[in-house]
């Protein structure tokens, strides 16, 4: 049994982690924590997230020193802000824990990337070297030996799952950059109240045009340039990405389908559509990424959907933990 600590459990992704870890037959929750300054400290997780009432009624404990919580802990999930994960991960690693970080603090092995896109100076370049990128379907072997796993961002997960098989099979003309138009539910902005996320203000709107930090994350791990435009949707959760690409001359629809099938035939959390394209409603609340596509001449449109809090965050983190410790990949997820 793996003793498991969830840090930042009060947020949306944190609550989903609590659900998955609680029903995992090989994990035991040792504590749920929030920052010492959090207004949620001392409250029950089930008071903040009533879907957990009678299932997990543990208190959210304030954490000011990791030594109060790290003894005897095998696994730590960090559902915390980027700067917080940056500071906490090295301490938990030093304490002998395996760390799964849901923030962006260790996703890209480039110190300059953090200064430009995250606004802080990264103090642990050696951990950027060591961290395994947790795109579970593609990086499984690296996960098996890693002690620090950087769980990918929500947008990058869907984008890479859709594009990697086609790039690896050399089917795309990358002189024309893939164009990724992605829309996410408001939960992607977190639980904190903000006018821009309120019911009467939220609208379908692009943001972070040419500046969003997920663009370089996608491009770095794909090994190919992309144009990425995120949009805020007026719905609670889920991500839908419509990706437009150019195929190399002579590439057929059959070849595209074969590349996707070969990549995901034995990957249970990626569901491929033989006909048509996926709808968001079919993945919300589930740990899957659904992918469909259409071809017209040399033009390819791929549609990928996922729940941003699940396959885009908590479910993928638990999937990575399952791979790391040799459990069934879908354990506690489906």
UniProtKB/Swiss-Prot annotation:
An individual GO BP term: L-arginine biosynthetic process
Functional pathway: Amino-acid biosynthesis; L-arginine biosynthesis; N(2)-acetyl-L-ornithine from L-glutamate: step 3/4
Active-site residues, record numbering mapped to chain: 154
Ranges annotated as spanning the membrane: none
Gene Ontology molecular functions: N-acetyl-gamma-glutamyl-phosphate reductase activity; NAD binding; NADP+ binding
PROSITE patterns xrefs: ARGC
Cellular component, GO, one term: cytoplasm
Compartment(s) of residence: Cytoplasm
Pfam families: Semialdhyde_dh (PF01118), Semialdhyde_dhC_1 (PF22698)
Keywords, sorted A to Z: Amino-acid biosynthesis, Arginine biosynthesis, Cytoplasm, NADP, Oxidoreductase
Broadest EC class assigned to this enzyme: oxidoreductase
InterPro entries with a match to the protein in the record: AGPR_AS (IPR023013), AGPR_type-1 (IPR000706), NAD(P)-bd_dom_sf (IPR036291), NAGSA_dehydrogenase (IPR050085), Semialdehyde_DH_NAD-bd (IPR000534)
Enzyme Commission no: 1.2.1.38
Catalytic activity: N-acetyl-L-glutamate 5-semialdehyde + phosphate + NADP(+) = N-acetyl-L-glutamyl 5-phosphate + NADPH + H(+)
Family classification: Belongs to the NAGSA dehydrogenase family. Type 1 subfamily.
Function of the protein: Catalyzes the NADPH-dependent reduction of N-acetyl-5-glutamyl phosphate to yield N-acetyl-L-glutamate 5-semialdehyde.
Cited PANTHER family: N-ACETYL-GAMMA-GLUTAMYL-PHOSPHATE REDUCTASE, CHLOROPLASTIC-RELATED (PTHR32338:SF10), N-ACETYL-GAMMA-GLUTAMYL-PHOSPHATE REDUCTASE, CHLOROPLASTIC-RELATED-RELATED (PTHR32338)
UniProt-recorded name of the protein: N-acetyl-gamma-glutamyl-phosphate reductase
Source species: Escherichia coli O6:H1 (strain CFT073 / ATCC 700928 / UPEC)
């Amino acid at each position: 049994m793996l003793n498991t600590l969830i840090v930042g459990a009060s947020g949306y992704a944190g609550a989903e982690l609590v659900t998955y870890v609680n029903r995992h037959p090989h994990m035991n929750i040792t504590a749920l924590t929030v920052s010492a300054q959090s207004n949620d400290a001392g409250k029950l997780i089930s008071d903040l997230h009533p879907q957990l009432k009678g299932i997990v009624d543990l208190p959210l404990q304030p954490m000011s020193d990791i030594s109060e919580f790290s003894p005897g802990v095998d696994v730590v999930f960090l559902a915390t802000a980027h700067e917080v994960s940056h500071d906490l991960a090295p301490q938990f690693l030093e304490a002998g824990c395996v760390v799964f970080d849901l923030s962006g603090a260790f996703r890209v092995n480039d110190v300059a990337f953090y200064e430009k896109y995250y606004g802080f100076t990264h103090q642990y370049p050696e951990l950027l070297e060591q961290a395994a990128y947790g795109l579970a379907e593609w990086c499984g072997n690296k996960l098996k030996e890693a002690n620090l796993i950087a769980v990918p961002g929500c947008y990058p997960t869907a984008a890479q799952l859709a594009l990697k098989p086609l790039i690896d099979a050399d089917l795309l003309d990358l002189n024309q950059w893939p164009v990724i138009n992605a829309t996410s539910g408001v939960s992607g902005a977190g639980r904190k109240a903000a006018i821009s996320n309120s019911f009467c203000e939220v609208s379908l709107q692009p943001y972070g045009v040419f500046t969003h930090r997920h663009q370089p994350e996608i491009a770095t791990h794909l090994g190919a340039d992309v144009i990425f435009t995120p949009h805020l949707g007026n719905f609670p959760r889920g991500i839908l990405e419509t990706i437009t690409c150019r195929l190399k001359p002579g590439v057929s629809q059959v070849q595209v389908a074969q590349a996707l099938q070969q990549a995901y035939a034995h990957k249970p959390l990626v569901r491929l559509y033989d006909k048509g394209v996926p709808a968001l409603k079919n993945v919300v609340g589930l740990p899957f990424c659904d992918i469909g596509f259409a071809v017209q001449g040399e033009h390819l449109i791929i549609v990928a959907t996922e729940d941003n809090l699940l396959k885009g965050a908590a479910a993928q983190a638990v999937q990575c933990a399952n791979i790391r410790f040799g459990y069934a990949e879908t354990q506690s997820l489906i």
